[in-house]
Amino acid sequence: MAAFPNLNSGSGLKKLDEHLLTRSYITGYQASKDDITVFTALSKPPTSEFVNVSRWFNHIDALLRISGVSAEGSGVIVEGSSPITEEAVATPPAADSKDTAAEEEDDDDVDLFGEETEEEKKAAEERAASVKASTKKKESGKSSVLMDIKPWDDETDMKKLEEAVRSIQMEGLFWGASKLVPVGYGIKKLHIMCTIVDDLVSIDTMIEEQLTVEPINEYVQSCDIVAFNKI
């Protein structure tokens, strides 16, 4: 069971950021109620200072907007926060009685058996297509990738190298944590993590067509995949 201090403090966010350095979710290998517990404990979106928390927060926010989260999880404790219960997830807030009464009055004026207009048919088709697309996206697998990126020499500006790497943006690609690793003779290489949607991003293609060609190859000599794990 994971445990965190107050997540609205710098120390709490730092611990959560370290926890998510090598994880996509709070516990397990899919989004669960543990993620919702931590998500709701945050009073506001994390700043970009906490790279891993920001990546996780945006991912969970997107999941909640699209399809929700149903996995049970293995348990998490957040200081000052209560665990998410079945009732909290399943029970919507009660509607205002006045609003409900007004809606019921409005319903009396609606012709429930009128013919469907062309606009209504088109809207229904668009909704069906949207549901189908979101279902397909939900089923698509994801992978966590650790890449090893080497500069040309010790004079290469590693800050600009990382900026050039992160400038690659595409649907299904999410950059994560990074660090500089000494190689020798004053040279350092970049280790950087990313999460990809398998159906949308090919790491091999990205390396061949973007990371090792102009203008990024001004800084990058070579790029290798150190670890590739299905999520």
From Swiss-Prot:
Keywords from the named record:
Acetylation, Elongation factor, Protein biosynthesis
Where is there biased composition of kind Basic and acidic residues? 119-129
What SMART domains does the record tag this protein with?
A: EF1_GNE
Domain GST C-terminal residues, every copy: 11-73
Q: Name one Pfam family in it.
A: EF1_GNE
Regions of biased composition (Acidic residues) lie at 102-118
Key word Acetylation present = yes
| Gene Ontology cellular component list | eukaryotic translation elongation factor 1 complex; mitochondrion
Region spans: Disordered: 82-136
Sequence positions bearing N-acetylalanine: A2
Q: What does this protein do?
A: EF-1-beta and EF-1-delta stimulate the exchange of GDP bound to EF-1-alpha to GTP.
Protein name stated in the entry? Elongation factor 1-delta 2
